[in-house]
Amino acid sequence: NPCCDAATCKVRTGSQCAEGLCCDQCKFIKKGTVCRPARGDWNDDTCTGQSADCPRNGLYG
């Protein structure tokens, strides 16, 4: 993984993340970017811009 230092098993300097639905090229994806499309009555899940995780919004459409 180009975002990680294999010797230390930590994210490289200048990188924000190494994996996750809201991580792209070692950086957090912009807030509001859809990371999990709506299914059924649920709304889209979107990135926060602060984490590589894709949080469930828990809201119905």
From Swiss-Prot:
Tissues expressing this chain: Expressed by the venom gland.
Residues of the Disintegrin domain: 1-61
Cellular component, GO annotation: extracellular region; plasma membrane
Protein's UniProt keywords contain Metal-binding: no
Top-level division of the source organism's lineage: Eukaryota
Subcellular location as annotated: Secreted
GO MF term (any one): toxin activity
SUPFAM superfamilies (alphabetical): Blood coagulation inhibitor (disintegrin)
Positions of short motif Cell attachment site: 39-41
Keywords, in A-Z order: Cell adhesion impairing toxin, Disulfide bond, Hemostasis impairing toxin, Platelet aggregation inhibiting toxin, Secreted, Toxin
Thylakoid in keyword set: no
Its biological purpose: Inhibits fibrinogen interaction with platelets. Acts by binding to alpha-IIb/beta-3 (ITGA2B/ITGB3) on the platelet surface and inhibits aggregation induced by ADP, thrombin, platelet-activating factor and collagen.
Protein name: Disintegrin viridistatin
